[in-house]
Curated annotation (Swiss-Prot):
Molecular function terms from GO: metal ion binding
Localization (cell): Nucleus
One cellular component (GO) term of this entry: nucleus
Record's function text: May play a role in epithelioid conversion of fibroblasts.
Protein name: Protein yippee-like 1
Keyword NADP: no
Taxonomic placement: Eukaryota, Metazoa, Chordata, Craniata, Vertebrata
PROSITE patterns cross-referenced by the UniProt entry: YIPPEE
Length: 119
C-alpha cells in the first residue's frame, strides 16, 4: 500500500535589496517591483496592479468572466501562506487587443503592502 502525503509548499523570499510587494495580511512576499507592468487596473475591491510574475501565490480553476475590457478566462489567485484571495491570473483573452494580459497577474491594492527599500 502506498501512503499519500501532502507535500509542503515552501515560502519564497525575494532579495532584500529590491523593492517588493507583500501580502498585507501575513507579509508573505508576492512580487518584485521589477515585475510590475501597470498600476492602471481595477479589481473587484478597488485599484489593482498588473504583474508579469508573482511568488507564494496559488491559483484556482479558470472561468470565463466579463471584465471592464471584455471577456477573459481568469483564475482567482490566493496567498499560499494565509489563503486570502488577492486577485486573478489572466489565462486567456478573447479580444486580440487584450492578449498581452495572458499569463499575467492582477493583485488588488487592498491586499498588498510595499516592503524593502521604498524610502
Amino acid at each position: 500500500m502506498v501512503k499519500m502525503t501532502k507535500s509542503k509548499t515552501f515560502q519564497a523570499y525575494l532579495p532584500n535589496c529590491h523593492r517588493t510587494y507583500s501580502c498585507i495580511h501575513c507579509r508573505a512576499h508576492l512580487a518584485n517591483h521589477d515585475e510590475l507592468i501597470s498600476k492602471s487596473f481595477q479589481g473587484s475591491q478597488g485599484r489593482a496592479y498588473l504583474f508579469n510574475s508573482v511568488v507564494n501565490v496559488g491559483c484556482g480553476p479558470a472561468e470565463e468572466r466579463v471584465l471592464l475590457t471584455g471577456l477573459h478566462a481568469v483564475a482567482d489567485i490566493y496567498c499560499e501562506n494565509c489563503k486570502t484571495t488577492l486577485g486573478w491570473k489572466y489565462e486567456h483573452a478573447f479580444e486580440s487587443s487584450q492578449k498581452y494580459k495572458e499569463g499575467k497577474f492582477i493583485i488588488e491594492l487592498a491586499h498588498m503592502i510595499k516592503d524593502n527599500g521604498w524610502e
